[in-house]
Each structure stands twice: as C-alpha cells, then as structure tokens.
C-alpha cells in the first residue's frame, strides 16, 4: 500500500541521501531498496579488522556471567514480579560509555524476564527449580484475572490429545510458552522509521472500514482490524522503549550506527515481549552493509569502527535469554533462542548477495570467539564467490559454529532472494510469511502402536485407536505397513487438531504484535508440523522387510522387544532399498497432514528435525524393531542412526539428500561430524574438500533437489571426552546439534554422551 508521507521532508531526504530507487520510498519494500543499493563483494577476508579494546572489555564482562551460567546451569538472575512488555524495564547497560550499540532485555546483563502471557505454569516451575518464591499477587493476576495461552489450550484439549502429549507420540508442542518461529522484518524500522510504519497501519485499518460496514467476512475483518490496532500500539511502544536509551526512532536511520541501533531496537522489542521457542533475526548483514558503505564513502567510518558496530550488535544478540524450566532444557538444551541470521546466497538477477558485511558477521566468531548465537547460517549456492566459500569453510573448521542451507533449492522454490530461516531449517519470505510452529510427531512410537494395537509400550495404556495387535510370530511387512498407515491417519488428526487449538489460543492470549507489525498486512501462513524418529522407523521397516523380526511379548501379549534374524539395509549408506522407505514415510505423512483443515487456512508443511529432543524421544520410546534399545536416543533430525552409516561421508550425505523437500518444506536437518584428518592434512586442502562436499550435497537442478540443510562439526571425539572431564579448558567450545549451535558445557551429561556416540566420519 502506498503511504501518504512526504518523503521529500528533510528527515527522509537526509536519511536516504545517495540511495537509489523510488518504489521502496513510496511503499514498504525492503528488497527493492537492497537490490538498488547493495555492493556485491567477491574478494577475500584480508580487509577485516581486529576487535577494539572496548569490544574485548565488554565481552569479558559478559563472559563472567556466562561462566556462572555454565557452572550452575541456572540463570544469573531473573525478575520476580514484573510481567515483561516492550516498555516494562528501564534502560540497561553492560558498560554504557563503551557500548556503540545499546539495549538489554531487562535492566541488567543476562537477567531474565517473566513472560506470563504464554503461561504461568512454566514460570512457576522455573521459580521452584531455581529456589525462589513467586510473588503471590503476580500469580493471582495471571491465574485468576488474566487468562494465558496455556490455560486456553488446556481448556480445549481433548482426552486423546492429552494422552498423546503424555506418551510422547507428540512432544514439544508450544502450549505452555511462546510459539516463536516468526521473523519480523526488523530492517523496516531502520529504513523507514516508526512514523512511516505507523502511518501505513493507520491507512490499512481505514481501508477495512467498507468491508466492516458491509459485514464481509465479519469475524476475520474485526480480528484483522484489532490486530492492526495492536501493531500500531506496539510500534509506538518500540519508539517509547528506544527513547529510554536516548534515541528518536520515529525517523529513519541516518548513518550506519543508527541503522544497526534502530534494527536492534526492533529485534529487542520482539524478545522483550515474546519468549518464543525461536526468535530469528532474519537477513540483516547485506542490508546494513549499504549504510556502512555509504559512511565509508563519506569518510565518517573506517573498517575497525564498522567491525566494532557489528561486534556490539552481535554481542547483544548473544546475551538474549529466556527463563526456562529444566524440562524445557531437556528438549531444547543449552539456552537456544535460534536468533538465526542467514548470510550470502545469490540474487534472482544472478548477482551474489555476499557483501563485506557478510564477512564481518562471520568474523565475530574470531573477534569474540565461538558462540551459539546468533545462529549463523550460510545460504549456499554453487555460484557463491569462491573466496567467501573458502572463508566460511575455514570458519567451520575452526569453530564448528555455522550451518549451511541450500539457496539454489529455496531461492528457486520461493522465487525470492529475500527469504530467511526461522529456527533451524524453516524458510520463509521476510515480512510476507509467518509460521505456526508445531513441534514434531514420533514416527518410531507410532510404528510400535501399529504393532501393539494402539497400546503404549512404556505406559501400558491405550493411547491410539484400539485395533487388533499384530500377533504373527514373524512380523509381516505388508501387514505392518497397512497398520502403520492407519495409525498415521489417526496421528495426523490428533496433531493438526492440537495445533489448531494452540495457535487459536496463542493469537487470542499472546499475540506477537511487535513482530507482526513488521510484516505486510496480509501474510502467507504455514502450519509447520514435524517428524522425529525417521531413521528409527525407516530401519525398523527395513528390518521387517529384509530380515526376520520376531516380536517378544510380555504376559499381556504386548510386543516389548524384537529379535532380528539376518541382516538388513540401513539408512545412511546410499542403498535405495532402505532410502526409498525413508522417502515414502516423509511423503506419506505429509499427504495425510495436508488433507486436514487448518486454523486461518494455514498451508501445512513439515520438517525432519529434532533439536536435542532426540534424547527425550529415545527415553519415551521402547525397544524398536531395528534393534535399538529402549531409552536409547534417536538420531537427530534426518541423520542415520548412530554408527549405522558405515560407507563414509559421501554415501551418508547422498542418502539424506534423497529426502524430498517437496514434502518437507519446513526443512530437513542433517548434522554432519567429521574428524579434521578426513578433510586433509593441511588447511588449504581441508577448506577445498569441505567446499567440494557442500557443493556436491547441495547440488540442485531440475531433476535433483539436493540436500536442504547441513550442520558441520569438524572435531575429534577425544576433544569432547576431555571437555566433559575438564570443562574449564573449553569455556567457548561450540558444536552444531540438530539445527542449532550450543555451548558443549551447557548440555546435560546425557546429551553430551549422545553427541559423542554419534558417527564421526573418518573418511570421505
């Protein structure tokens, strides 16, 4: 919508001095601004500058708190009676005179806020876990006076849904905390200023008057008008919050420091007001590079100052914290917030979107050391400049802090070069698309239900529909598949029904006004489902098909263990016999999900992703027909089961790359660990070989999708074993797990052991 603001006014003319293009001035269109003004960079990293003394001093101050967190597995501090909002806290600083970019979630570094609107129970559990008492008035307010998202969901859940939740056939549902996975276009605040954005919402609100008076789609129209009003209110709150730090963000940013600061204030408002499971940053590096390059040309900024701006911005992202429970940590370990920033990629016009600022973002892993946040994600294309490819490979080899995603696949699929990644692997066009996050369904447990007639093998209660159990002495593949298909139908209904409830209630009681204010009015919504236990279910079905699997039953006839006679092909070795089973399961479940009605007509998608919940899923799932023992962790994401991918890196990568993105458009996570020696004896060879692996895995053409996502760890198992025994020697040791990075010291002992038990590829 065209915005009727006089952009010839001095405030806008000064801010946009030297910027090319006109469409983006008349209506909100950040992509158009970028395409007209960014400077592609095809050189190497030799221009980069070291950290300033201020950066080093500030980061050491932050690290003091992080060391306390690592040692205690507890927050440094948290509020006791303030319900956080965008404006709830006064300004907070690390050391104000040294900070080029300012702003904290609360009034002190690493102090955590209370987010009661998603649910009071998680906060109560946190108080109990960390030895504090909740203020009685605060508890009364959010129990009796102000209904929360969590209360709304559990008021409406069915008994079947509650049993699915208890058994672990559905796990990680966002029914007690913020759903997240929404990416505000935080760049809009820097480019346009708050006044421009507020005016757009006022015009859009007025535009609905006729529809309202005619009674057209009445409930949806009223809801949209209320949401637009909330957007306007949230934008003004962001302006008020920034004023506490001495900044007037009603106008556009006029220089690089203001552009970084304005953008960060927009993101800060999001993490002040929501505790979503994933609070992604978006695609900011090349946008900010435009301002930095303009300041370079004006002679008001040099390279070290530019790096300092980025360092201080990234430092603030590294400090974002939410108050979580130990139970949450068992699912999503190590305080992840998934502040995912995508870097690189190619434009639709064939130009690379790599800029010098792309290098600066990666360089923060040197200036301040490795860190899990922000979740730095390389959008990989075979056409990326070779110097950037090699630099990214070098950063991975040294820090194990990067993940890679297939730009050639997703750019083509979206027909957009302005998309980003929500959480770990979920692509969406920035400002035009949002996601209803849906956690994941346990396919391995579903297979056991298919064998046992819907009885849970751990709880010994009826969870699925009551059907005749499969009582053959040797499991018959066709019968098992028929039964599994029936139970997948049932699971899809329970899953989508639960998600419809969750997202209705989240919109009602914990709406993300500050994030949605930075979207177009009419957004494309997806309902993001997920699969866990894919490799367990796949190998189990392969064993049933190609070997002889005999159920071992308890006194009630329940299959509680399995005896395998013979060998069977295992997923992860580029064997079509078993890889085709994995592909079928992905396609089969997606088609069942897609057939069901969804809240707000969201388009169903699914991911193959577990985060660190692969450990909890293993705990909740009994012995499986592939020979996996009860309690043993699942493989993460789309990974082959630990130790079963025996034919080297290329075979394992090839198996995973076969999984159809067409039926898993919420992403397919693969975590790849390789010992340094397998990549080569010297650094130049290692970089070249890693670049070659990435090019091969992500290769995309008309008939070949290519892999979608790859975590890369380059390290020896022996180092991780030493880190368990001597954590003080490795304060910043960062590893990639399923879809994100985490400080190794922040994992539980069980999760550390799970990481160590995974395949470390010894050869290409």
UniProtKB/Swiss-Prot annotation:
What this protein catalyses is: 2-oxobutanoate + CoA = propanoyl-CoA + formate; formate + acetyl-CoA = pyruvate + CoA
Q: Glycine radical occurs at which residues?
A: 739
Top enzyme class, one word, equals transferase
Q: What induces it?
A: Strongly repressed by glucose. Anaerobic growth of the pfl mutant in the presence of cAMP and L-threonine induced synthesis of TdcE.
Task: Write the record's keywords in alphabetical order, separated by commas.
Answer: Acyltransferase, Cytoplasm, Organic radical, Transferase
GO terms for biological process?
Answer: carbohydrate metabolic process; L-threonine catabolic process to propionate
Q: Where in the cell is it found?
A: Cytoplasm
Give a GO molecular function annotation for the protein. 2-ketobutyrate formate-lyase activity
Cellular component annotations (GO), alphabetically ordered:
cytoplasm; cytosol; membrane
Which stretches make up the Glycine radical domain? 636-764
User: Where is this protein chiefly located?
Assistant: cytoplasm
Any idea what a deletion of this gene does? No discernible phenotype.
Q: Does the keyword Cytoplasm apply?
A: yes
The pathway it acts in is:
Amino-acid degradation; L-threonine degradation via propanoate pathway; propanoate from L-threonine: step 2/4
What Pfam family does this protein match (any one)?
PFL-like
What SUPFAM superfamilies does this protein's entry cite? Answer: PFL-like glycyl radical enzymes (SSF51998)
- Ranges of residues in domain PFL: 7-629
NCBIfam families linked: pyr_form_ly_1
Q: What is this protein called?
A: PFL-like enzyme TdcE
Q: Which organism is it from?
A: Escherichia coli (strain K12)
